[in-house]
Structures are given as C-alpha cells and as structure tokens.
Amino acid sequence: KPWQKGYYELPLQKPADGVTPAGEPFAYHANDMSVGDIDNDGEYEYFVKWDPDNSHDVSIKGYTGRCFIDCYKLDGTLVWRLDMGQNIRAGAHYTQFMVYDFNGDGRAEMAVKTAPGTVMTRFAPDGTVLSRRYITMPQKDLDAGYSHADNYVCTAQDYRLHMAEVFRRWHTHPEVVNGRWPATVEQCFGLAPQYAYPLCEADALALADYFLDVYAPSRSPKNELRKFEGFVYDGPEYLTMFGGDGAELDTIDYPYPRVDDGLLWGDYAMPRIEPCNRVDRFNAGVAYLDGERPYLIACRGYYTRATLAAYDFFENRFHKVWGIDSGFVPMANPFNDSGCHLAVGTDPVYGILAGQGNHSISTADIDGDGCMEIVYGAAAIDHDGSLLYSKYGTLPDGRTRAKFGHGDAMHVADIDPDSPGLEIFNVYEEGERAPYGWALRDAETGDVRFGEYAEEDLGRCMIGKIDPNTRGLQVWVKDVYDVNGRTLELPTPGTNMKIYWAGDLSTQITDGADYLYGNQYGVINDLTHGVMLQPAGTATNNGTKGNPCLVADVLGDFREELLVRTADDTAIRIYTTTNLTPHKLFTLMHDVQYRCGVAWQNNCYNQPCYPSFYYAGDMDFANVLPQLNAKPTLWMAGDSIMQSYAPGDKPVTGWGEMLHTLAQGDAVCCAAHRADCPFPQEMRYELPGLVIDNCAMAGRSSKTFREEGRLDDIAAHIRPGDLLVVSFGHNDANRAKAERYVPADAFGESLRPFWDAARSHGAVCIFASPVAMREFDEAGVCHPSFAAYREAMRAFAAEVGAPFIDLGAA
C-alpha cells in the first residue's frame, strides 16, 4: 500500500509523566531504537527506549525517572513494555539493549542489564494486559534478603552515611591492608593524624563531613557532593534475555560487578570527583565469534578498568564463552591520582586494555579469518578472547610512550578500497597526554596510517563518500582528508551521524547545516546534493549529539531509513529515500557486520554502522559478495578410487572424474590440468555453475597426501564458499607400507589438517568413507570395507560438525 505522505508514522504509547523524590516533574521522550523480527513473519518489530527528560550522564548528579523499553508491531500494536525499575538509572550509559536472534529459532530476543524491580508487562492485540511479571532473581539473592521492593537510589544523606561507612572500614580495605593505599583517611587528604583506627562512628562521620565540605570542593568547585543524589551504588545487577514475545528466558548475575561506588575505578582520583562515573560505563554488542553464530558481548568500564564477557545463548541459557578483565589500575592515593587514565591494570595479560575503550564498540572481522573481533577503541579483542592489540605511541617529545586512550567516536569500515581489509578512524580524548588527537589506522594491526597530535579533546569525527572525484572514502574532524592523509579543499560536513540516502552510493549526514544553528531535527544533506530532507515536526535525541532514534536499512533497498520521533513523541516517523538509483544491491541488513552494527548502534554515543565492503559510487560490486560472483570449487582429496586418469590409463576410471556428470548432468564440461599445479595427475572440470578440482592421487594415504604438499596446494587456492571432499582409508590401513600407514585410532587426527585447511579459508569440508572393495557374500550382498576407518572418520566428522557421507551405505 503506497504511503500517503513522504514518511510512515508508527504510533507510540507514551509513558505517563512523573515526579522525582525531590519534587521535580519529568516527561518522556522516545530515545534509542532497534529492530528485530520477534515472530518470524518476515517483518521487523520496533524496539523503543523511553528516556525521561531528566535522564543524566553518569557524571551528572540528580534523580531520574524510570527507563522503559517498548516493543511495537509496525502498525503500532504494543506487544510489551519493560519497566527497568527503580534501580536502573536513566541515561545513555546505563541501558544498552541488544536485539538479535541469539538462539537461532528465527525470532529475535533482547538482552539487557536489569536489577531488582525490573518488570515486564505483556499485552494482547487489543491492549489488555496478558501478564505482568518481575524478572527472576537468583535464589542466593533472595536468601540474602534482596527483593523487588528494594530501592538503592541514594539521597544526599544516604551518600554521607555511605562515605562514613567507607571510612569506618578503611583499615580493612584490601588496598590498605596490602600497603598500596595510605593507612589512614587523613593521609589521603593530606592531613595530620587525628583519629584512632578502626574509626568509631562519630569520627567516620566527621571525616565524611570534611570530605564533603572541605576536601572535595578544594579539588574543584564543581565537586558539590552535598547534592550527590539519584545514583545507585549498591544492590544486585543482572543480565536478562527476553524472548521476542516478552517472556523471560534467563537471568544471571551481570558479569563483573561494580565492587564499589567507583573508588577502585578512579572516580575519586581526579580533580573532578565523580562517584559512580567510571564504574557505570557500559557497552554491549553482537559478534559472530565463530563465524557462524551470534554471541552477546557485555562490557563494563573503559576509562580505567575494562571488562568484557562473551556469551552464547544457543540453548536458551547464557553460557559464558570467555571473559576479559584488565584489572583495576593501581593508584597511590585513590583520592588524588590524576594519572589513573594513563596507567595499566593489574592483569598481566589484559592490563594494557585499561583506559583504551570508547563510548561504543564495533564488531567486525578485522583479521580476515572469517570470525568477528571486538574493536574496543584503541584496542581489539580477537574472536577467542585473546588480546589482538592495545595501541601505544610516542608523545611529541620523542621519548614518552603513552596509550592512545579513550575516544568519543569511532568508525570501522573499508575506508581504503585499494588496501586489503578494514580501517579504523578514531578521535581521542586525552589531549596533550595522548600521541594522537585523531588517526586513521589499519584495523588488523591497529597501526596508524596517518593522524595528528592535538592538545585538546576532539569529540567527533566522521567518514563517508562525500567527494566523487577522490578515490576511497573521506575522513574528517576539523579538515577533510583522503585515504592517504592528503587535505582536501572541501567544507567540513557535520559529524553526528551518517546516512546512505542518495542513489549514487554517496554518504549523507543527518545533522548538516541545521545542526550548526542548534535546531536539530534530522536534516539530511551533503556537499553535492545540498539539503535532501527536512523532517519538520520531528526531534532528535541526546542533546548536542542530535541522534535520530535509528538509522538503518529497515526497508531493504541498500539505502537507509531515518527513524526519528515526532516533536510530541506520539509516533516514530520512518523516512525513506525516493531518489532513483541505477544500482542494484541486496539489503544492507544481510551483511553480517552491518546487521550487528544496527544492534549495537544504541550504545551510549550512538555511532553509525557500516557494511563489511567498500560502499561508494566507485565500488567494485564483485567485491561485495565474492563467493556469489565466482563459481564455487569442489576440491577433491583422496586416493586411486577418486583419482582422474589419463586416456592411456583407460578403462580405469576414478569416481572423482565422473562427478561432474552427476553435478550438472549434460552440461558442457571443460576439463584441463590447472597450470600452476605441480602434480600432473590433477584435473580441473569447468561447469557453468561449478568447478571440480580433482587432486586425488593413487597410493596416497591421508598422511602421505599431506607430506607431499598436496593439501598445501589445495589450501593455497581454496576460497570462501568452496567445498573440500576428503576420502581416504584404503592406503592408511596398509601396515605393509609404513610410509602410508595410519592406525585407525589415529585416523581422525590425521584428517584434522584437511578440516582446518577448509575451515580457515571459509570453505566446507565433507568427509566420505572408504569405498567398498567388492567383497560379496553368497547372497550377493557387498560388505563395507575398512569398518574401523569408516567409523573413525564418522566420529571425527561428528566431533567437528562436518558432513559425513557413508559410501558403503545401502
């Protein structure tokens, strides 16, 4: 049905206004969004986070209203509403909701951080309530007396008493006991000894008052900690997976608990004392860590301590695959150590990860192994949880080595189409204490291609195809550069959010000229086309960041839709481009890197998502899906029964040279030896939609085939989307020839290199059992041969999850 206007409006049900404990009224605005098909009907549902207008950054004091997440059908039917509860503060850094089909059932789930008080309400299509249910708290927490009625949101008086309790227990703190922190609170504040330890309640309160009224303001006049209220620094924290229908599937403890109110995290160490700041910085993402299935990534911390955990949810239960913890950054004085952002954590392996993260993450296959990695700002985590790199550089003095450090914006994409792999464009916040203010880096190694030192915090950057006359994407902060670092004489576009809108595969920006005047309502423009959309009557989010609710290719023509809230928050407007295009390309949501990016776009400082391929007017479409633009090759590794034979050897024939007749019937087949193959018996069969490359050789076992370099030859040519059929056993079983012999109990391991060669190149390995030796019984029934080798192959195939063909089966 054609749209009546230039947009579609998805009706919303706005939560009721509220009042904080301080008597401050607040109202709600539709904020971040995500999409997922919750019922497998082929149509996305729309997930909307509601933020109160008093939602806060983690560094800002004050109460907030509750946060809600709704799930809507496209017609506006409310499927469910998740009330995050009283113990989840509202703000960009607290609630990252990952919408994806995590269990592979064809329906999207949602993973999100929860707490006591989080409650789900599910609705019937007519709006009546089907159920209202709190999340399931672990039995250990119920036994400890926690309940959904608990409220851990602090008042100013609560915080005063909390600090008194911290001081009263000072002598028992592990850092004090181990001699790493001053033995007394007075020493931390630079005071002469005044009190006996352990402190009594009165002395602890006296020190708390001194801290609030004297010490903290002396560090910075902005440290008005008598007004510290609205934060949560106590109580359980959970990670919950909800089904698309709103049913709770599993709840576990959130990985890496807060431990304290930020004291160990460095929240009291800087001149600006900001309790509950660094400790409550969360990120989340989705990554195909094994190249085949989606995993949830849950993160906490990036200014100092950095932690990440990876979970699979394949069996409707969280299963932790790996965890990473930099450890806390050591401080000589937790109340005065401004170098904590620059130091490393205590973990001997992951310590250098500390302080390197951003306000978002990216997930992409940056090393070309078919598995996705996590780009954590200036660091990268390999798919197996190992640290790929954490980047350091040299300051302008030429001597001092420093970490790249935290940054606010990052883009991971194929920026330079003439350089293999992906690139990263990043800004960095540490100013004069960091080697770069911005840099373009190689994604696989993290090495800088070009960049500049900057003494100030650079908060934004962007990439995109904005100059049709320059090869590659362009990158910009203050100036615009090409992929080689050459400054282009172009006006600098906005840096809030990119969008693919035009029909010429160029890049547009959603803030543009209107952002410069402070009236943010999602204007789309670029340097070539000018203003392309003015969505009047709408509003963007997150203050000066001017974020739409979502930018994603939700309708499926390889351009992106702009999803923004109406100014009165009664609807989400979905704008789609009507610009004609001569290009054909699949929906971007079918590119795994892009689809995962749509899931993590709602992280903190919303960042654009990019496909895994170079997206621009000068793109080579053959590089988009190379496995679909080239014929797959079926490689064959085996012995005499599979081998191709020369005309002089006839009538001897191996089944490998006859396979093409079964693969594509009477199709014309061109058979020839591959020119670069060093083995003369190899034969290549070219069919209209398939190539069969038969590398089998008589007299070879799985062992000698490898030792002669025949598998190496296959590995040098096999590509993603190819197949490798492996069939050995006859010669492996020949005890009389030791050079060939492989015992049956070692046969599986002898096959493993074949599996590894295929798997590492994105190909599929298929195992076929030894062919029977024409041994018939009196009834004329052929008996399978080499049973032990057949079963060993079957077992190995089952172990690695490879297809197995029993050639001896009836």
Indicate residue ranges for each PLM-predicted region.
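Short, solvent-exposed loop/turn elements at domain surfaces
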Residues: 17-22, 55-57, 643-648, 701-704
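Beta-propeller-forming repeat regions
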Residues: 1-626
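Structural recognition of the beta-strand scaffold that forms the well-ordered cores
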Residues: 47, 111, 373, 633-638, ...
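A structural motif corresponding to the C-terminal end of an alpha-helix
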Residues: 72-76, 238-248, 682-689, 753-765, ...
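Serine-esterase "nucleophile elbow" of acetyl-processing enzymes
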Residues: 627-696, 712-720, 724
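Charged, often glycine-rich, active-site loop that binds/positions anionic groups
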Residues: 95-96, 698-714
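Solvent-exposed loop/turn segments at secondary-structure junctions
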Residues: 53-54, 87, 116-118, 640-644, ...
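Alpha-helical cap/lid subdomain in secreted, periplasmic
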Residues: 709-810
